[in-house]
Amino acid sequence: ICVIVVVVDVLMVLYIRAFNKMRKLKNDLLKEYQSLYEELQYRFKLAEEYLPLVRSYIDAGSLEELNKLINDFKGKVDVNDVANDYYSLNNSMVKVFSIASSNNLSFPDWDKAFNDSLMRIQNSITEYNDEVLKINNLVDMFPSSVVASITGFSKWVYFRTK
């Protein structure tokens, strides 16, 4: 009977350690996603502020598309939806930048802010995806995979990079 008690105790310790590790990683992951989301919100805000500066040079369809992207982004939290909107915004802004430069428009402060934002977002994406890798590895590996299935931990979605 003493052996059974020891085995149960060891299993309980392993279970608690695995659960706590997954819980901590989930909290870290949520923190990284929040940080990434805030950077993305700032980028969309920059785009929204830039549009009035170039409004007269952009065709109505492109302007409407950008405004729709900016408005649709607000309130989204799903990683895939957020990534799709982010990359769509970037593609649209490349077109706007080329139109602005072809019309000899220059906004150095805004360009610097937009480029700085891009670097911060890329760093946030890397940090978020690193946390996703850690938690997904735990969900896949024994014995934490058993704990994950019992407690409902599941794999997380990576923020795609293109």
How does the language model describe each region?
Residues 1-162:
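A helix-centric hydrophobic-segment signal that preferentially recognizes long
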